[in-house]
Each structure stands twice: as structure tokens, then as C-alpha cells.
């Protein structure tokens, strides 16, 4: 599970770097793997800080704590820059604008990276506190975690138990990788170590098609291992050193298989973000790849030396060499160093990197157990050790059974541009550049820690082997343990063990027994053959230490001399000379010193073969050291040659690529310059053409301007001559205009005089023509009036008949209703009798049954009763038929009554309209009736004589009140009387006047009816005007006319109100209302119509009068109506003469002339209420005629022409 999370951390970090270089302005391109990921993922959304946090939570508290410290170290410069933004910027301000922009572009990806790390750190700190409490609670049960390097209880138990925090982990791999995580966790922590070691080589990813087959192959391998383990259950867990590891438990084979297979997988592998599981998790899908977990229990501690050797081989081949020892019996974390097995692209990208071990490296604990997380500080734990703290102690106090942890694997040189990330401070205060990124060093540090544990386990296994061989010894010696371990290990594993333990524990090598001498010599030969793995300095140091140990072990006796190209020989001296001084053995790669102390014993005696043993050994040692130096320098030279060749090749390739790039850029620049030159030439040609066009346009405008100036001078000269001509003609025109005005005034005066004469002549002719037309119109109107009278009489008779018939029908209806009531009563009586008879029959039948009458009598009675019932039924049916007939008749009569009632209502409404119209006309006539009173003075006595009432009180010159006397009203007749016009009354009209008024009213009614039914036809006569009506009255009722001869003398009303004849030469009489009514009732007038209650007033002398109404219909005096005037009278006073048509007598003196003059004024044809026509000024305005219509007001239609157009 740790491996899965660390893999996700590494890949996510690379992805973030690529995204930062792609998204931020001026960012670098990142590493090759990041570029490949960016190309594969395209525009896919990148991971957030939560993804990194989820990946780290699955690692455990220890790794999270180390990662937190690393993030703090990475973010420290960013915080310092934020807190002090102005420090260190003077030089930057002095640089140019381009340099500042370039720096800002380079800082953009770093700012994005720091922001992501800060976000992840905050989230991890909050979650670590929560997981700390959960871990303590789980530790209380004692079954939630697995021990460090100890037996895991088997795969099945591990799977059932699960990793700590696995239930809450939501890493970038999701649930699809859960089976593989269970396999790795159940196999033990060493499985995780191998898995991480394999992931170290994730540089060249295989094609995606290999990911699923690899997972299937792993599943088959595990199943096969499970079957083999079950089949070989009796085989011992640890095989002999010479046998293969086929008999190992499934967990061991899983280790080997993972170390081999996963070392060749990349980001596109089963667990990579670009592989099937990663893509499926990103898309929310599940990959149908399941890994079956074997059910065989496996114990990591039961691994044999061969299995441990395979594990170490895998780790060494993955890039680990020359770690620094940290003391005997304690596992340390060596500094990662690239081995020659790595390809060139796996070498450090930063030139001049210090690949040697560092003094600040400390072991990294694998399982922190339940200890609290250390507080992040500015110094790692190893730095605290160098500051004086004791190893294994934290600032808060010591912790038992705990190892110091150190996040010194922080990326010094992250796979990005140089200088983007801060450097990890070293013990000496300077920076140390690393060759691996943060995720790589995370994986390598933990894997190397597990490698140390594997070595310790191998040493323990060697001790067990030595104890089993030497049964007499109580405890295995160190040389026996080492010999057993080296004998069981391979070359590479032995080399690792020797390099890890021997340089720091040479004192333990000095105690090798004689049994280990041959093993040490063989190891020396193996080390000399494995020089390609380690550097020459370490090899020579190890060889010198072995030689010294061999000489010390042999003493004065013969010893074993180990040289580079020598065979094993027996040395004459038994031990080193006595004067051998202490020598310092320096391990160049790890820069650690180890002292070889010469034993304090006497020198060996002299020998003939070796007269000077001490000098010989001293020279021999000096020669060996020189040979070691030669070998070391040769190795360094070869290494430098290789490096130089690689650098040369790299620089040559870079130079070639740069040259090719520069050639391409030069070609592009040349092409762009040629295109720019062609474009500029085209622009220049177009500009020249444009300028030539502008010049031509300016020349054309200049030519036009010159022509315009020439024309302007000619036009100005011509304009001056035209102005002079205009002034002369203006003066002539004014003179002519004055002459024309004078001639016009003279002509206008002449025209006025001529037109005035013509107008007078035309007026006289029109007046004569009008008189002739009025005479004809009057006769036609009289005929129409008679026809209207006949029609009215007929309608009256028909109305009376309808009323009588209606009364009869109403009486019949009442009779039928009475008969209907009687029929209903009869029906009820018959029904009541029928019920009574039925009851009687029932009673009789019951009595007959009781008394036992005979059947014949009963039948007779019943027959009689049935006959009676039949008669009653027939009578009832007849009554019902009669009732239905009467009801039908009543309905018909009711319908006829309703129709007749509607007709009567229509006639009544028509009569009401006629009556209202006539009443209005009578009210108007009442206003127009005047009474002429003549006052005579004889012998100082005065008397008043009233003339008959006249129509038109305003014609006499007086007002309607009759108070003023018009000028000229008095005359010098015989008697010397004055005539006064007073308002008259309708009852003073004579029968002749009433008849004429009634005729005029009928004419008006006929005309109004015609207007209400539509426009007049050509055959319908126009209504009578005042003048026409006066002419008709003068012709029909004047003196000598038939109407006048039929009139009798009527009594006159004197001034004192008495009735009787009126004396005087005029013989005039004024009839009273009672006399007029009596005359109308006596039937003395032929012109009385059959209108029932209507009486006709008559007049004489051509006087226009107004009509009266019947007594039953008259609304009384003062009712408003239509004002109307009558017209002409015959000149002369014959009809008012002394012969007297009415009152008798003869003569017609001056009084008659005065009356004629007054009547002529009243009944004048032209402007009766104003001035005469001759007195009116001439106007050109044409007045339209006025037409009297029903509903118009009477006051604005008062005139002498009535409804005729003037």
C-alpha cells in the first residue's frame, strides 16, 4: 500500500510539474516523463492537493510526517519571499525589462508548485491529527497493524486484517488496485520494498497493451506459488544455499517476481496514472482485472539466505551502491547513488552533482507504531543530532524502541529547471545537490531501509548457521556470522553486505577466526572481480583491511597474503613487525576514517629469508597502497573518460540539435525576411501608385480652379451690366405701376355705379317673378289641404269603428270567461256528484249483499246507475269540448285585441304628435295676433275703436307689449283718430280668420309629415308662405268674393268690452271668442272640417292670422309653439270700406287707408321685421334659406316665408 501511494505521489508530482510548465507563462517543459504524460492526457483536468494528500495518508504516519517536513523545507523560501518581498531585489531592479519578464516567467511554475504544496500540507496536517487518534484506538486492540519485518501471520490474515487506514484511503488509484494492494500487504513489508525498488526504473513505460497481461501473469504466478506451497508443505522453509528458490513460500516468489516484473513497468503500467487502472479510475469505470490472493500463510522471517540474496540483488541492480555504514548491529539508510547499471537518461540531470554520501543521512523508520507525530521544524532529525541531541530522542523527550527518522531524501535537484526549487541545507551549511526527485527519493529511502533490515535478517540467519556448525561454542562469533552470511549470499549481495558493514566495523573483521580465512580470501577475489560495481577506493580500503586482519590473525606463523594478481601464498612471518605503526585507512567514497591498531606484542624473531621483515612489510604495504592508488586513479580516469565521453556525446548531440535548430531558424528568418521584403516592395509600389493618383488629382483640381477663376471674372463683368439694366427697368416699372393703379381706381368706381343699377333692376324682376310663383303655390296648397282634411276624416271614422269593435271583442271575451267559469263549476259539481254516486253504489251493493236482495233487482239498479253515469260522462265531455272551444276563441280574441291595441296606440301616438305640433303652431300664432285700436277725438271727447285682431304685432312698429306707437301710425282722417296696435287674443279672431289659420296649420302639418317620411317629391307642393297665404285670403275672402258674401255681420267688441255693432265709417267689427265659437257651432261656415272638436277661425282682408285649437285639446294660453306669419294683402281698402262685408256700412275713408298701410307693413314680403329692401346696403354675401323641421326651435324660424327658401 505504501508502494501504491508513493507511486501515485511520484507520478502526480511529475504531472504537476508538466502542468505548471504548460499552464503558467514562461514555464519550462519539465522532464521527458512529464512531457509524455502531458501528451497522453491532453486537456484532462489535473489532480488537486487532495489527491496528493490521499496518496500520502495511505503511507502511514511516519511517511506523512517526513513529507510534511520536506514540504516545509520547500515552502520556507516562498514564505520568506512573501514576508520580505523587497529583499534581494536591487539587482533585479537594475536589470532590463526583458530580464525581469524572463524571471517572472520562470517564477510562475514555482509559485504554482508552492501553492499546491501548501494546500496539500494544510490538508495533511489536519488529517494526520485525526489519523493519530484513530491509530491509537486501533493499537489498543493489538490486531490492527503488522510488525516491522516480523511474521505477518500469512496472506489470508493480512488480507482479512487489511492495512492501517486502508478503509479510509481514497488515493488516485481508487478501488481498482485494491487486490494488488492486498497482495503486497499480505506478503509483508519486504514485498513493498521490492515493489518500490522495481518502480525505480519507471522511465521508459511499456505500451499499454502489456499492462493487463502483466497483471494476469502475476495472478497466475501467485496461484502457481500457492499450489506449490500446498504440495511441498513438508519441505523446510529455508532451502540450502546451492538450491534454487523454488521451494520458498509464495511471499518470497512474489518478492522476486515483483522485483523483476515491476522494474520494467512505467506510468502506463497496471498502477500508473496512464495505465488501464488509472484511466479507468479517472473515468469512473472498473477494469476486469482481479488478482487472487493466495491463502497460504507466509512468514517473512522464514525467508532463507537465498531469498534474501535475491531481494538484495534486485535492490542493488535498481541503483543502490556504496552506502555508508552506521555502526555494527544497526541498520542504516545509505545515500542513494546511481550505479553503472543505469542508462544515461537515468543519470543525474544536474552537472556537478555531489553523488557521495552525506553526513546528514540518518536511518528512516519503517513502522512508527503508536508514537506521536513529531512537530515540523526547520531542521530534520539528523540535523538535531548534529546540534547535540542524542539519536532516538525527540525534542519532547526520549522514545524507547524508536529509530531516528530523517526526511533527507527531499529533492535537491527536482526534475525541472536548475534553481527552481530550494536546496536542502547540509551539515556544513552549504547546499548539496541531489540527483533524484522528491517521489524518487521517497521510494529509494524506504527501499534502502528495508534493504538494511534484510541484511540484518541475513546476519541473524548467518549467526544461526554458525551456531549450528560450531555446536561447542556458546555464542556465534562475528566472523562466523559474517562467513556464513557471505557464503550463503551471491557476489552482489556479499558485496553489499561487506560494503555496508565492513568499513565501519574493521575491528570485528580483525577477530576473524582461522576458519574464516579462506572465506575472506575468496571474498577478496570476488571483490576484485566486482570492481565494476564499487569504486576503486572502497575496494582497496576493504582489501587493505582484510590483509591487515589476516596478518594479525596469523601472527608469526605463515599467513595468507591476498594480492590483486597473486595467488594465495604462505607468509614466512607469523605476524606483522613490531614497529608497525597505526595506519589510517580512508574510505574515499564515504569519507569516513577507520584506524587499524597494531597489536602490542613483541616483534617476531629475525629470519634468514626475511632479514628485515618490518621494512619489507612496510615497503610491501606502501607498494600495495600505491597499487591501490593506481587502481583508484585508473578507475577514476575511466569514470572520468566515460563521463567525459557521455558529456561530449551529450554536448555534441546538443550542439547538433542546436545547429539544426539554428539552421532551421535561419531558414525561417530568411524566408520571413524575403516575404517581408516582397511585402514591403508591394506596399511601396502601391504607395507610389497612390501618390501618383493624388498628384494627378491635384493637377486636375488646379486646372478646374483656373477655369473657375476665368469664368468668375467674366461673370462679374456681366453682372455689373445687368445691375445697371435692372435699375433702369425698375424705375420704368414703378412709373407704369402708378399709372395702372390710378386707372384701376377709376374703373372700380365706374363698375360700382353700373352694378348698383343692375342690382336694382334684377331685384324688381325677381320680386315680380316671386309674386307669380306664390299665387300658383297657394292654389296647390289649398287643394292639398282639402285632401288632407278628407284623409283625416276617414282615419277618424276608422278609428271609431276599431274602438267600437274592440269594445265588442272585450265584451265577448268577458262573456266567454264567465262561461268558462261556469263550465269549471259544472265540472266540479259533476265530479262531486260522481263521487257521491260511487259512494252510494258501494253502500247499496253492501246493503244488497247484507240483505240478500235478488240479483235481478241489483242489476236493474246498477243499470240505471250506469246509464246515469253515462249521461253524466257525455255531458261532462260536451262541457269539456265547449270549454276548449271557448278557450280557443278567447285566445284568438286576445290576440286580435292585442293587435288592435297596438294599432290604436300607434294612431294615438301619431295623433299626439299631430296635436303637439298643432299646439306649438297655435302658441306661435297666439304670439303673432295683434289688435288694432283707433282713437278718435271729436268736440273735446275721445273714443276708442278696436279693429279686428291682426297677425304680427311687430309689423306696426310697436313691441309685443303694444306700448310704443309706430311713426306714421296716426292719420288725419275724418274724426282725427290715431291707430294703435295691441297684442290680441285667439278668441277675438273671426270665423274666416280661424278657417284660414286652420288651413295654414294643415299645410304646415302636411309639410312636416312629408319631411318626416322623406324628401318632397316634385309633385308635392311647397308649403304656403306668408305672402301666398295672404293673397289666397284676399282673393277668397275679400269683398265680393264667395267666402266674404257668405259671412254675416258679427257683433264687434267695443273699447268698453260690450258686444254689438260698431259705428263709424269703417264698419269694422271684432268678434269675440264666444261669437266665434257660436259661429263654428252653428255650422255657418262651409270650410269647417269633420275633425270633431276643431274649429276653424276665418279672417278677411288678407290678414294673416293664427289658428286656434279645439276646446278639448287646447292646452290653454301661453303654450309655446311654432311662430308663423302670413303674407300679402291686396292694396286698397275696399274690403274694409263702408259697404262692409262684415259689419255693413259703406265708405272707406282715411281710416281704411291707415289700416291698409299698417297691414302692408306687417305682411310685407321683404324683411317684415326689419328695414325695407330699398333701405338695406348692397352686400355680396349669399344667405342660404331656412327650412323648418320637426323638433327645431320656433324662435329662429320666424319669418315671412315659412319653410320656403328666400
From Swiss-Prot:
Residues 1175-1184, 1193-1206 have a biased composition (Polar residues). Residues 1037-1046, 1058-1067 have a biased composition (Gly residues). Residues 634-732, 799-833, 876-903 form a coiled coil. Keywords: Cell projection, Cilium, Coiled coil, Flagellum. Residues 26-52, 79-109, 125-173, 327-405, 936-990, 1011-1072, 1168-1206 are annotated as: Disordered. One of its GO terms (cellular component) is motile cilium. It is found in: Cell projection, Cilium, Flagellum. Residues 88-109, 156-173, 385-397, 951-973, 1014-1035 have a biased composition (Low complexity). Its main location: other. The keyword Coiled coil applies. Belongs to the CFAP157 family. This is Cilia- and flagella-associated protein 157. The lineage of its organism: Eukaryota, Viridiplantae, Chlorophyta, core chlorophytes, Chlorophyceae. The gene is CFAP157.
Amino acid at each position: 500500500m505504501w508502494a501504491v501511494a508513493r507511486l501515485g505521489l511520484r507520478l502526480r508530482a511529475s504531472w504537476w510539474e508538466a502542468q505548471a510548465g504548460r499552464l503558467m507563462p514562461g514555464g519550462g517543459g519539465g522532464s521527458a516523463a512529464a512531457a509524455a504524460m502531458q501528451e497522453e492526457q491532453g486537456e484532462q483536468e489535473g489532480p488537486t492537493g487532495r489527491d496528493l494528500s490521499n496518496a500520502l495518508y495511505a503511507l502511514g504516519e511516519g511517511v506523512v510526517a517526513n513529507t510534511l517536513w520536506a514540504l516545509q523545507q520547500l515552502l520556507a523560501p516562498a514564505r520568506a519571499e512573501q514576508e520580505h518581498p523587497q529583499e534581494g531585489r536591487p539587482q533585479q531592479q537594475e536589470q532590463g525589462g526583458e530580464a525581469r519578464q524572463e524571471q517572472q516567467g520562470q517564477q510562475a511554475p514555482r509559485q504554482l508548485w508552492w501553492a499546491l504544496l501548501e494546500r496539500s500540507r494544510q490538508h495533511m496536517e489536519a488529517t494526520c491529527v485525526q489519523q493519530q487518534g484513530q491509530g491509537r484506538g486501533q493499537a489498543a486492540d493489538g490486531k490492527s497493524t503488522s510488525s516491522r519485518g516480523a511474521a505477518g501471520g500469512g496472506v489470508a490474515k493480512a488480507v482479512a486484517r487489511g492495512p492501517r487506514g486502508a478503509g479510509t484511503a481514497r488515493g488516485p488509484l481508487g478501488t481498482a488496485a485494491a487486490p494488488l494492494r492486498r497482495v503486497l500487504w499480505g506478503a509483508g513489508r519486504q514485498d513493498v520494498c521490492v515493489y518500490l525498488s522495481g518502480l525505480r526504473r519507471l522511465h521508459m513505460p511499456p505500451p499499454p497493451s502489456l499492462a493487463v497481461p502483466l497483471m494476469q501473469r502475476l495472478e497466475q504466478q501467485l496461484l502457481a506459488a500457492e499450489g506449490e506451497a500446498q504440495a511441498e508443505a513438508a519441505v523446510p522453509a529455508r532451502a540450502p544455499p546451492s538450491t534454487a528458490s523454488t521451494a520458498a513460500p509464495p511471499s518470497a516468489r512474489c518478492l522476486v517476481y515483483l522485483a523483476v516484473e515491476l522494474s520494467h513497468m512505467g506510468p502506463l503500467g497496471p498502477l500508473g496514472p496512464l495505465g488501464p487502472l488509472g484511466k479507468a479510475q479517472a473515468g469512473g469505470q472498473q477494469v476486469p482485472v482481479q488478482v487472487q490472493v493466495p491463502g497460504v500463510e507466509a512468514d517473512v522471517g522464514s525467508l532463507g539466505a537465498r531469498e534474501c540474496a535475491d531481494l538484495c540483488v534486485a535492490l542493488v541492480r535498481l541503483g543502490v551502491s556504496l552506502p555508508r555504514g552506521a555502526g555494527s548491529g544497526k541498520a542504516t539508510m545509505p545515500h542513494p547513488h546511481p550505479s553503472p547499471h543505469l542508462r544515461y537518461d537515468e543519470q543525474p540531470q544536474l552537472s556537478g552533482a555531489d553523488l557521495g554520501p552525506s553526513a546528514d543521512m540518518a536511518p528512516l523508520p519503517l513502522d512508527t507504531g503508536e508514537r506521536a507525530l513529531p512537530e515540523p521544524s526547520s531542521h530534520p532529525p539528523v540535523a538535531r543530532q548534529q546540534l547535540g541531541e542524542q539519536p532516538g530522542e525527540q525534542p519532547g523527550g526520549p522514545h524507547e524502541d524508536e529509530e531516528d527518522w530523517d526526511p533527507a531524501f527531499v529533492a535537491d535537484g527536482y526534475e525541472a529547471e536548475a534553481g527552481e526549487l530550494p536546496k536542502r541545507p547540509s551539515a556544513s551549511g552549504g547546499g548539496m545537490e541531489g540527483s533524484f526527485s522528491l517521489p524518487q527519493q521517497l521510494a529509494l529511502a524506504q527501499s534502502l531501509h528495508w534493504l538494511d533490515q534484510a541484511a540484518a535478517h541475513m546476519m541473524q540467519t548467518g549467526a544461526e548457521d554458525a551456531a549450528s556448525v560450531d555446536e561447542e561454542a556458546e555464542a556465534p562469533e562475528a566472523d562466523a556470522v559474517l562467513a556464513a552470511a557471505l557464503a550463503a549470499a551471491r557476489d552482489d549481495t556479499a558485496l553489499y553486505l561487506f560494503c555496508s558493514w565492513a568499513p565501519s566495523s574493521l575491528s570485528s573483521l580483525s577477530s576473524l577466526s582461522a576458519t574464516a580465512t579462506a572465506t575472506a580470501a575468496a571474498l577478496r577475489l570476488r571483490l576484485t572481480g566486482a570492481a565494476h560495481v564499487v569504486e576503486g577506493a572502497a575496494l582497496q580500503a576493504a582489501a587493505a583491511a582484510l590483509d591487515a586482519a589476516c596478518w594479525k590473525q596469523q601472527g608469526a606463523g605463515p599467513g595468507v597474503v591476498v594480492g590483486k594478481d597473486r595467488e594465495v601464498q604462505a607468509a614466512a612471518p607469523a605476524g606483522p613487525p613490531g614497529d608497525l605503526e597505526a595506519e589510517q585507512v580512508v574510505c574515499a567514497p564515504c569519507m569516513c576514517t577507520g584506524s587499524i591498531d597494531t597489536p602490542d606484542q613483541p616483534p617476531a624473531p629475525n629470519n634468514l629469508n626475511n632479514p628485515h621483515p618490518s621494512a619489507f612489510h612496510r615497503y610491501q604495504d606502501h607498494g600495495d597502497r600505491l597499487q591501490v592508488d593506481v587502481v583508484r586513479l585508473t578507475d577514476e580516469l575511466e569514470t572520468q573518460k566515460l563521463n567525459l565521453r557521455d558529456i561530449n556525446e551529450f554536448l555534441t548531440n546538443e550542439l547538433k540539435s542546436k545547429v539544426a535548430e539554428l539552421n532551421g531558424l535561419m531558414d525561417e528568418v530568411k524566408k520571413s525576411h524575403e516575404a517581408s521584403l516582397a511585402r514591403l516592395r508591394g506596399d511601396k509600389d502601391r504607395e507610389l501608385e497612390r501618390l501618383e493618383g493624388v498628384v494627378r488629382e491635384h493637377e486636375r483640381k488646379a486646372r478646374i480652379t483656373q477655369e473657375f477663376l476665368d469664368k468668375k471674372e467674366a461673370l462679374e463683368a456681366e453682372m455689373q451690366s445687368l445691375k445697371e439694366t435692372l435699375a433702369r427697368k425698375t424705375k420704368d416699372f414703378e412709373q407704369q405701376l402708378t399709372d395702372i393703379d390710378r386707372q384701376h381706381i377709376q374703373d372700380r368706381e365706374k363698375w360700382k355705379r353700373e352694378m348698383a343699377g343692375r342690382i336694382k333692376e334684377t331685384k324688381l324682376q325677381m320680386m315680380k317673378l316671386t309674386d307669380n310663383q306664390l299665387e300658383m303655390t297657394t292654389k296647390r296648397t289649398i287643394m292639398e289641404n282639402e285632401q288632407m282634411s278628407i284623409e283625416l276624416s276617414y282615419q277618424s271614422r276608422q278609428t271609431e269603428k276599431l274602438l267600437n269593435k274592440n269594445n265588442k271583442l272585450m265584451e265577448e271575451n268577458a262573456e266567454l270567461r264567465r262561461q268558462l267559469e261556469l263550465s269549471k263549476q259544472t265540472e266540479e259539481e259533476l265530479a262531486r256528484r260522481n263521487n257521491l254516486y260511487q259512494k252510494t253504489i258501494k253502500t247499496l251493493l253492501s246493503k244488497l249483499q247484507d240483505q240478500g236482495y235478488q240479483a235481478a233487482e241489483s242489476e236493474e239498479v246498477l243499470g240505471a246507475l250506469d246509464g246515469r253515469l253515462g249521461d253524466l260522462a257525455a255531458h261532462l265531455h260536451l262541457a269539456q269540448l265547449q270549454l276548449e272551444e271557448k278557450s280557443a276563441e278567447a285566445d284568438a280574441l286576445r290576440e286580435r285585441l292585442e293587435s288592435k291595441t297596438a294599432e290604436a296606440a300607434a294612431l294615438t301616438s301619431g295623433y299626439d304628435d299631430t296635436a303637439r305640433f298643432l299646439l306649438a303652431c297655435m302658441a306661435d300664432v297666439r304670439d303673432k295676433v295683434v289688435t288694432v285700436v283707433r282713437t278718435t277725438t271729436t268736440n273735446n271727447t275721445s273714443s276708442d275703436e278696436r279693429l279686428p285682431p291682426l297677425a304680427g304685432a311687430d309689423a306696426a312698429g310697436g313691441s309685443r307689449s303694444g306700448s310704443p306707437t309706430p311713426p306714421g301710425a296716426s292719420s288725419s282722417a275724418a274724426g282725427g283718430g290715431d291707430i294703435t296696435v295691441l297684442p290680441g287674443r285667439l278668441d277675438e279672431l273671426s270665423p274666416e280668420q280661424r278657417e284660414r289659420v286652420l288651413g295654414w296649420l294643415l299645410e304646415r302639418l302636411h309639410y312636416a309629415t312629408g319631411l318626416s317620411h322623406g324628401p318632397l317629391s316634385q309633385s308635392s307642393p311647397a308649403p304656403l308662405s306668408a305672402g301666398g297665404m295672404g293673397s289666397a285670403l284676399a282673393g277668397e275672402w275679400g269683398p265680393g268674393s264667395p267666402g266674404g258674401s257668405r259671412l254675416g255681420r258679427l257683433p264687434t267688441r267695443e273699447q268698453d268690452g260690450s258686444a254689438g255693432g260698431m259705428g263709424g265709417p269703417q264698419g269694422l267689427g271684432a268678434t269675440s271668442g264666444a261669437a266665434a265659437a257660436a259661429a263654428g257651432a252653428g255650422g255657418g261656415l262651409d270650410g269647417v272640417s269633420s275633425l270633431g272638436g276643431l274649429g276653424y277661425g276665418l279672417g278677411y282682408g288678407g290678414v294673416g292670422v293664427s289658428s286656434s285649437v279645439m276646446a278639448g285639446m287646447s292646452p290653454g294660453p301661453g303654450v309655446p309653439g311654432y311662430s308663423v306669419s302670413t303674407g300679402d294683402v291686396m292694396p286698397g281698402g275696399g274690403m274694409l270700406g263702408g259697404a262692409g262685408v262684415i259689419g255693413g256700412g259703406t265708405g272707406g275713408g282715411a281710416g281704411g287707408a291707415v289700416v291698409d298701410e299698417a297691414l302692408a307693413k306687417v305682411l310685407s314680403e321683404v324683411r317684415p321685421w326689419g328695414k325695407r329692401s330699398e333701405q338695406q346696403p348692397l352686400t355680396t354675401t349669399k344667405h342660404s334659406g331656412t327650412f323648418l323641421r320637426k323638433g327645431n326651435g320656433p324662435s329662429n324660424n320666424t319669418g315671412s316665408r315659412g319653410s320656403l327658401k328666400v
